[in-house]
């Protein structure tokens, strides 16, 4: 009988000790992950773009400095009559940085815009039909060569996944971001 009680006691103590060790390991891993997050958090303010909810946040640490409803990539696919005329209109995901800020940006119409509008594609890059002012709003903040945060002609479409990949915001928010955001500030898009 005593042997049975000792066996039962060992069976109870051993799992408790294993659980205690597991909890200690979890606590250590939790501290390590929190430190990793702290190390990854930018020291400057940064932009976070949620493409699922179409929200743009300007943050500093845990504080939200500005929140704006935006429009992001539609995910739609377009194919032209040539095999290299294929596009998917997604907003790129990842970590970027504000590389350039432009007032009164010039939109250089890409080939896909001519195909979408059933227009003849200009042969020469210098063709005047490619250049349009006012389409991108008053400002543009580039985070990649062909991708930017810019304005919109139709603020009613904010909050929708409707763009060709850029991030559109309303006029007041765009002016705030242009005046506030500095070159090099991180942009996180998911």
Which residues does each predicted region cover?
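N-terminal pre-domains immediately preceding structured catalytic cores
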Residues: 2-190
């Amino acid at each position: 009988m005593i042997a049975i009680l000792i066996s039962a006691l060992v069976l109870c103590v051993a799992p408790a000790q294993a659980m205690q060790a597991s909890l200690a390991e979890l606590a250590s891993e939790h501290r390590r992950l929190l430190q990793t997050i702290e190390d990854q958090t930018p020291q400057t303010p940064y932009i976070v773009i949620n493409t699922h909810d179409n929200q743009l946040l300007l943050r500093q640490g845990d504080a939200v400095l500005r929140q704006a409803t935006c429009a992001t990539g539609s995910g739609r696919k377009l194919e032209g009559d040539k095999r290299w005329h294929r596009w998917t209109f997604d907003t790129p995901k990842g970590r970027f940085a504000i590389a350039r800020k432009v007032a009164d940006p010039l939109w250089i119409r890409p080939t896909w815009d001519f195909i979408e509008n059933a227009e003849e594609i200009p042969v020469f890059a210098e063709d005047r039909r490619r250049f349009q002012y006012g389409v991108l709003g008053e400002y543009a903040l580039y985070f990649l060569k062909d991708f930017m945060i810019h304005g919109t002609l139709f603020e009613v479409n904010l909050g929708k996944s409707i763009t060709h990949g850029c991030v559109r915001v309303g006029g007041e928010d765009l002016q705030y971001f242009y005046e506030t955001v500095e070159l090099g500030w991180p942009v996180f898009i998911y």
